[in-house]
UniProtKB/Swiss-Prot annotation:
It is found in: Cytoplasm. It comes from the Bacteria. GTP binds at residues 226-231, 245-251, 270-273, 335-338. This is tRNA modification GTPase MnmE. GO terms for biological process: tRNA methylation; tRNA wobble uridine modification. It comes from Sodalis glossinidius (strain morsitans). Keywords: Cytoplasm, GTP-binding, Hydrolase, Magnesium, Metal-binding, Nucleotide-binding, Potassium, tRNA processing. GO terms for molecular function: GTP binding; GTPase activity; metal ion binding. Mg(2+) binds at S230, T251. Exhibits a very high intrinsic GTPase hydrolysis rate. Involved in the addition of a carboxymethylaminomethyl (cmnm) group at the wobble position (U34) of certain tRNAs, forming tRNA-cmnm(5)s(2)U34. GO terms for cellular component: cytosol. PANTHER family: TRNA MODIFICATION GTPASE GTPBP3, TRNA MODIFICATION GTPASE GTPBP3, MITOCHONDRIAL.
Amino acid sequence: MSQTDTITALATPPGRGSVGILRVSGPLAAPVARALLGKLPRPRQAEYLPFRDDDGTTLDQGIALFFPGPHSFTGEDVLELQGHGGPVILDLLLQRIVAMPGVRIARPGEFSERAFLNDKLDLAQAEAIADLIDASSAQAARSAINSLQGAFSGRIHELVKALTNLRIYVEAAIDFPDEEIDFLSEGKIEASLNDVIARLERVRTEARQGSLLREGMKVVIAGKPNAGKSSLLNALAGREAAIVTAIAGTTRDVLREHIHLDGMPLHIIDTAGLRNAGDEVERIGIERAWREIEQADHVLLMVDGAATPLSDPDMLWPAFIARLPSGMPVTVVRNKADLTGESVAISDISGYLLITLSAQSGVGMDLLRTHLKQSMGFTGGTEGGFLARRRHLDALETAATHLQQGKEQLVSACYGELLAEELRLAQQSLSEITGEFSSDDLLGRIFSSFCIGK
C-alpha cells in the first residue's frame, strides 16, 4: 500500500468507554476535517465541535485537534477526534471518514511506521511504543519510556560514531600505505578498538537486563507425582492457583501463572507428575509436560524429601536427566523440609544446585526467589535502563563477534582490509537496531505486531 495514502483508525481500545479517539494521518487530513467539522481547527489547539455526517446531521460532538506536518507524530498532517466512547458512534464516525475518497483504514502499526519513515522516531523508539503499551510492570513501563525517549538509541548512536571514527583511521592506513606513521601497528587503533569493544559489552549487559524485563523467564516445575509441584506453584504465585491434594496425579494438565520478582516477569508452569501413565488423560498431560520442559528457560526438579533420602538427579532419576535438552539449567528443589526436619539451605550436589525448602509452609521460598533472579543475571536496577528485544540482543552479539574477529586480524597480522570489513559489518549490525539499515521484511514484521491505531 502507498505511504501517500491518508489513513484512519481508532486510537482507543474497542468497547464502551467515556472517550473514544479517532486518528487521521496523511495529505487528506485537512479536507477530512473541513468535511466532518465544517472548518479546519487552528493548529495544535483543541476545539469543541460537532462531528457531522455527509447530510449535515450531527453524529457526535467532542474535541478536535489538527497537527500540520511535519510537526506531528507521523510527520504528516494529523487530525485527532476525541468523542464519546460508544462503539456504535465510533463506528459511524469511522465509516464516515473511510467513505471519503482517498482515505483507508490503517494497517497495524502504520502510524508508528510512518513516524519512522518520516524520521520522527527511529526503529528502537517505535518498538518502545508497543513495549510501553504491553508493559506488565512499573519497571518495564519506566524502561519503555526511557527507550521511547532515546536512551537505547543514544547508546547505539554513540557506538556507531565511535566505529565511524575508527574506520576513518583504518581506511587512512589502507589508502596511504607510504606514510611515515603506520597507523595499524602504532597501537592507537588497537586501543580505540578495545575501547569500543568494552563499551559495546556494557550496552549488551544493559540490553540483557532490558530483555529480561520485557520477556521474563519461563520456569517449568517438573517431578514425580505428589512431590509438591502444585504447592510450589501456589507459593510462588501467592495464591491457590492449583488444586492441592494428597492424591498423586491431581494435576493432569499444564497450569500457568505470571508473576514478577522485583520487576522481572516470571512465567511459572506447573506440569503433570511424570510417571508411566495410568490412563489416556494422564498420558496426554505427561506429553504436554515434556513439551513445556523442552521449551523452558529453567527447570525446577521437585523431589519429595519425605519419600527419598536421595537428591542427586543422576542417581535419583537418570532417565529424566538424560531426556533433558543439552545445557538446560536445572535446580533441584528438595521439598517438605517441614516434615523431614531438614535445614533450609542452598547447596551443591554433583554440579546441580540444591535448594531445601517447604512449599507448604513457605520456609525457604525467599532462597528460591533470589536464586531464580540470579540464575538469569537479573539485578533489578531500572534507573536509566531500557527495554530490549531478541533482535536487539542478536544484533549486539553479531556486532561483538565482528569486533572480536577484527581485533584478531589486527593483532595477529595487521590485515587492514579485513579489519575494515569487520568494522563495517559491526556498524551495519548496530544500525539494524535503530533502523538505519533494515530490510522491508524486517519492518513489516515489527510494525504488523502493533495495535491498529499506533
